[in-house]
Amino acid sequence: MQISQAGINLIKSFEGLQLKAYKAVPTEKHYTIGYGHYGSDVSPRQVITAKQAEDMLRDDVQAFVDGVNKALKVSVTQNQFDALVSFAYNVGLGAFRSSSLLEYLNEGRTALAAAEFPRWNKSGGKVYQGLVNRRAQEQALFNSGTPKNVSRGTSSSKVTPKYKVKSGDNLTKIAKKHNTTVATLLKLNPSIKDPNMIRVGQTINVTGSGGKTHKVKSGDTLSKIAVDNKTTVSRLMSLNPEITNPNHIKVGQTIRLS
């Protein structure tokens, strides 16, 4: 599963936004910017936009999304997942993995798991109102209803594969590695305005590599391809973001099926 915009908004509401680089403590090695993004990639006089700050936050949160996914052994709703990611992002993955909250949840005792949120209201043994407020909102989100559970491992919703940029990478090289195009990567990553401006450590959306494909033949339509391969048009369009109109595919075009 991936965190929703509602989950991102919850985290943003508690992290606070700074568009100029700063040091909370003068002796800190690196600068901080955006929603608490800290590291060697932040320069002393750097200034960013609110959109760039959210993109940085999403990159930072991704490790916690992955960590929560790995720790869960049961089905959860999107709201529950968002609350868990916010919680893990705040307390740390180690604390989340060893928590009674996760233990109860994986045992199927959801009500007991929800009751654990308010206990995590201290830092250094002292209760902080900010943590009380955050836990209350996470608990409320966790307990709020959604239309249906999202089954782990069998969900029909697509989780976009991720790739972390390494030293020496460029968008052309990444596209080739994942059997796709730079244009497709740019559509999957609207925050990338310049294909020559990606940074080491950045997490970008990619298409799955090595999956099943179909080369469009004369007489093919997206509906026919979907039926022949026991899938749906919407699923094919999500796998092929370069297809913006299901009625416009061309002979010889390669379409990803999985």
UniProtKB/Swiss-Prot annotation:
Record GO biological process: cell wall macromolecule catabolic process; defense response to bacterium; peptidoglycan catabolic process; viral release from host cell by cytolysis
Localization terms from the record: Host cytoplasm
SMART domains for the chain: LysM
Disulfide bond sites: none
UniProt GO cellular component terms: host cell cytoplasm
Domain notes: LysM domains are thought to be involved in peptidoglycan binding.
Protein name, entry field: Endolysin
Organism, scientific name: Bacillus phage PZA
